[in-house]
């Protein structure tokens, strides 16, 4: 379906251009230091559309697409935003924020899928939403756990990098 090829290019390109502009415009001039996170996230989003996904319980799913392009993408996008804004909070608040972001973007995606099907722009099954939500959440959780480990190791002096200052 041609529309998905457009989405795979348009969404990450728009985010890669617009997000740094919006952050700089709002006083977050340090975002360029973390822009690589944004670019990796956008690359994962693009690649995810072309990865094969497994059958689950005999059902054709887009699990890999949602894990990589939904969850890992959102987790890295979140890490870029949090780092650029130098936002720090209790670990539980940070966990909730990444979960809220992946849930919101996942909901927008599912609504977009429904719209495209009902408008005749795409012919896809809409019965794998539960697997999509799980894949999005697992992908974002993977990034969040990596974030926690990296922060812990940086504080212990085992990793060189930004200590949050």
Locations of regions flagged by a protein language model:
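Bulky hydrophobic segments
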Residues: 1-127, 138-165
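Divalent-cation-assisted or electrostatically stabilized phosphate/pyrophosphate-binding catalytic cores
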Residues: 132
């Amino acid at each position: 379906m041609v529309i998905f090829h457009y989405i795979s290019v348009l969404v990450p390109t728009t985010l890669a251009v617009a997000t740094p502009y919006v952050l700089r415009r709002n006083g977050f001039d340090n975002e360029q230091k973390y822009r690589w996170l944004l670019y990796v996230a956008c690359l994962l989003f693009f690649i995810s559309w072309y990865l094969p996904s497994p059958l689950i319980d005999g059902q054709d799913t887009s699990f890999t697409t949602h894990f990589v392009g939904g969850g890992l993408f959102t987790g890295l996008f979140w890490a870029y935003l949090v780092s650029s804004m130098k936002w720090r909070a209790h670990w539980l608040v940070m966990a909730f924020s990444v979960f809220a972001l992946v849930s919101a973007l996942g909901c927008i995606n599912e609504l977009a899928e429904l719209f495209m099907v009902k408008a005749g722009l795409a012919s896809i099954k809409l019965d794998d939403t539960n697997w999509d939500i799980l894949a999005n959440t697992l992908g974002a959780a993977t990034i969040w756990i990596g974030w926690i480990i990296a922060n812990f190791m940086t504080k212990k002096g085992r990793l060189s990098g930004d200590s949050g200052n």
